[in-house]
Amino acid sequence: MATFKDACFHYRKITKLNRELLRIGANSVWIPVSSNKIKGWCIECCQLTELTFCHGCSLAHVCQWCIQNKRCFLDNEPHLLKLRSFESPITKEKLQCIIDLYNLLFPINPGIINRFKKIVNQRKCRNEFEQSWYNQLLFPITLNAAVFKFHSREVYVFGLYEGSSSCIDLPYRIVNCIDLYDRLLLDQINFERMSSLPASLQSVYANKYFKLSRLPSMKLKQIYYSDFSKQNLINKCKIKSRIVLRNLTEFTWDSQVSLHNDVINNKEKILTALSTSSLKRFETHDLNLGRVKADIFELGHHCKPNYISSNHWQPASKVSQCRWCNVKYVFRNMDWKMESMYNELLSFIQACYKSNVNVGNCSSIESAYPLVKDMLWHSITKYIDQTIEKLFNVMNPVKVDGQQVISFHWQIDVALYIHIKMILKTETLPFAFTLNQFRSIIKGIVNQWYDVTELDYLPLCTEQTDKLVKLEEEGKISEEHELLISDSEDDD
């Protein structure tokens, strides 16, 4: 077990490049870090252990030892974890880069074997080639990878993942890319590696190689917002941001393949890039479709639809003295956009409901209450039209000129009044709404705050470091709430 970790430890003194690349946290002094009780493979040292969340991508893929290095497979610094990472599609050329990297960093030849033999022979009772003392030489070259599926793109992190574990809570799945390369050619490469080993170790090497190289691939898992840590989320002025740490270098490469070519042919450039790299802190916005869905689900769960039959003049989120309508505590850590959407939706539905249904106060039990919750839950799904129609029908619509309409003569907020006029593109509001107008207003309120067609599926922490740098230079890495405030002040 942990052959990759042992190989990094023993091979780190072979060359100058090895000293820089094979310095992993699992072989350093342990610094206590809280565990998240998620068992899986650390993609940096490849050992099977309890994982914690990465500082760079907020996903659970790093062990309690390697977390101290603050490395992520999305960095642009050419450390070992980055060199083992490739984005889809996986080609034979990329797989050859992985094989060449393993052969460069972890060679097996008579000189290496004699070097390790001398080190081991310095200690008594270790004269034989026992597996426990020569585990670093039992490093077969396989093409297994931990795959992160970020909606439309996939990132493969190659490594020697030994053992078995339940992958239910892991953000990645282990796949075998041997069929994308050449089984017989990979077998030949490993036979040549093991030919220099003593006979007692050859059988162990061969057994380990065939066991790992013939593993079936797991079914890929789509990463969802629930897979990301909330520990690095901050809430400033009801705006959620995520703190992301990435390792940067000033050197650039056209592709990952060209980076590997420099590892083989231009080692000085790699060493310079490693020695001049720095750790950069990004404060990225957390506005994405996954978080919006999670917030809307929570909002629908805590929603108090009794507000639509009440006589409260305050916005729905500000009611605090009413046992049937109080949701004030829900918005303590919720996005300001969600609160504004909730207020406008419930104020509009309240005005429509009070205009058409003879209802007393917020303690009443109404058939429309479940539909209000459903409307929130379905506000960004394909079922929104059906839910709006059901809500419209419980407001006792009447038929006028062949169309079902509801009355509208209840007081509303000035800002909401102006917003509805903009949605309907009219100078004055009518005293009756058709189903199409009612639907347009509700959808317009939702889309003003959350236009799902423009949202990314996942947080920005899943993007490559180069893209984060570019977004920061363009001023697009944070939410535009402060810009909106500045614009409104300038208009006044």
UniProtKB/Swiss-Prot annotation:
Region (Zinc-binding domain), start-end ranges:
42-79
Q: Name one GO cellular component term.
A: host cell cytoplasm
Give the region (RNA-binding) as residue ranges.
Answer: 1-81
Give the main localization category. Answer: host cell
**Motif range (pLxIS motif):** 483-486
Q: Where are the coiled-coil regions?
A: none
Give the highest taxon in the source lineage: Viruses
Q: Which family does it belong to?
A: Belongs to the rotavirus NSP1 family.
Name listed for the protein in its UniProt record: Non-structural protein 1
Instruction: Give the originating organism.
Output: Rotavirus A (isolate RVA/Cat/Japan/FRV64/1989/G3P5B[3])
